[in-house]
Amino acid sequence: MAAEFKHISVLKEELVAGLGVKPEGHYLDVTLGGGGHTELILQQYPDVRVTGVDRDSQAIAAASERLKSFGDRFRAVRSNFGEYQPQGEKFDGIIADLGVSSVQFDQGDRGFSFRFDAPLDMRMDQQQTLTAADIVNTYEEKALANLFYEYGDERLSRQIAKKIVMKRPIQTTKELEEIVFYTYHPKARKVKIHPATRVFQALRIAVNGELDALQYLLVNAPQWLKPQGRLGIISFHSLEDRLVKNAFRQRDIWRILTKKPMVASETEINQNPRARSAKLRFAELKETTE
């Protein structure tokens, strides 16, 4: 399985540079994935250590294999970062690359993408019980509509929810994709972004508790960081970016290092289209709270 997990990290150079890595520092990567960001830190700074956290067992296996040459400078922890608790240690910096990995999108049987006909799953942690099919088939119509609107900014949320309830049970990605697609007017179907994208995003966020995990990180990161430690977060949609921006602004313990988010270059976007929506924000923990 490890060989199959080849995630392409976005804004890799910018994220590592923005950390301001300190000699003999200890860093926390709460979204380890395939290990791309962690690998760059370990390569560029030979006296630092990184602890990597991921809820996906395939990611942990792949990253551990990829980074084994770094020995005890790297440690992997299988955990949802929304539940992670450091064992009394403090870090010089924390990084998070939010959302689903390119590998998870490309593994058709995991149900993250409507490009493949697969069970409606969408679990990052395959040991959890809640799936996208559970939500689609058990939520009341109003709850589904609210979910699609709030987590996906879906303007046809009510119409889509009504059709879903009429056609239940729905078990596969293609079934759901077709319902959403044909809810749209024929002219609105011929757009760059597929009509089902927002509904699939909303379901993925709900299944994996992504916003709750981010809130947990934003609340707890100050306790995990040493003074002048930095927190760098890459987000992929407006809900995430808004949470990060507001958390940095509303708590006086942070010194904001990016007044506007950093974005990918055209070169990177051409090489990795996923980078187009990525936004990177940094803040530094003040030495003392005022």
Swiss-Prot record:
Top-tier EC class: transferase
Any matching Pfam family: Methyltransf_5
Binding site for S-adenosyl-L-methionine: G35, G36, H37, D54, F81, D97, Q104
Keywords, in A-Z order: Cytoplasm, Methyltransferase, rRNA processing, S-adenosyl-L-methionine, Transferase
Matches recorded under InterPro entries: RsmH, SAM-dep_MeTrfase_MraW_recog, SAM-dependent_MTases_sf
Regions crossing the membrane: none
Record GO terms (molecular function): rRNA (cytosine-N4-)-methyltransferase activity
Coiled-coil annotated spans: none
Catalytic activities: cytidine(1402) in 16S rRNA + S-adenosyl-L-methionine = N(4)-methylcytidine(1402) in 16S rRNA + S-adenosyl-L-homocysteine + H(+)
Subcellular location: Cytoplasm
GO biological process terms, semicolon-separated: rRNA base methylation
GO cellular component terms given for this protein: cytoplasm
Entry EC number(s): 2.1.1.199
SUPFAM superfamilies found in the cross-reference section: Putative methyltransferase TM0872, insert domain (SSF81799), S-adenosyl-L-methionine-dependent methyltransferases (SSF53335)
Family matches, as NCBIfam families: 16S rRNA (cytosine(1402)-N(4))-methyltransferase RsmH
Family: Belongs to the methyltransferase superfamily. RsmH family.
Protein task: Specifically methylates the N4 position of cytidine in position 1402 (C1402) of 16S rRNA.
Protein name: Ribosomal RNA small subunit methyltransferase H
Protein source organism: Picosynechococcus sp. (strain ATCC 27264 / PCC 7002 / PR-6)
